[in-house]
């Protein structure tokens, strides 16, 4: 199974997305790939790759047989199509639903089944979240390949997220990020509670002092 960098995943995700949503613009030029990579909507994280960065990444993917130059293009500008999946001699054969899930995981990072159902709406049809669950189960053992994995559920969340396993990104970083967020929340809550206790202690001390003063006045009378 191939291992891709986060930037290479972004490029292939863009190719998969545009092939389905704007087939009239596919194969893509270098400019089209760059624009798709740096798109602010439907991307996480948002990237700022230069055209030269993208050219280097495209060249790497061509060497890996994941992209090819379209020799049939009638323009002077090179256009590229992917060979990542669903090719005659490739190992990865996806259903439209499996392909849509992988595409969104490439473009947006870890997702819950509910998020995947919403965010694949232009790529494939899912009747309900259970169909997404079934697709994720299939991708966990697709012809002997484990392409996605379920992450630990985040505190306060109803669903666990899933991450694809075709990247060299460390999965533990997602768990660490969740742990850090939880620690920050707990720290903020603890600080707020401490401040509240201090305020109450000050109020009690003030009331006690007032009561003592009143008691002294009554005793003097």
UniProtKB/Swiss-Prot annotation:
Source species, domain of life: Bacteria
InterPro entries the record matches: DUF480 (IPR007432), WH-like_DNA-bd_sf (IPR036388), WH_DNA-bd_sf (IPR036390)
Family matches, as Pfam families: DUF480
Coiled coil: none
Alphabetized PANTHER family for the sequence: UPF0502 PROTEIN YCEH (PTHR38768:SF1)
Record-stated family: Belongs to the UPF0502 family.
Name of the protein described by the UniProt record: UPF0502 protein CPS_0106
Organism: Colwellia psychrerythraea (strain 34H / ATCC BAA-681)
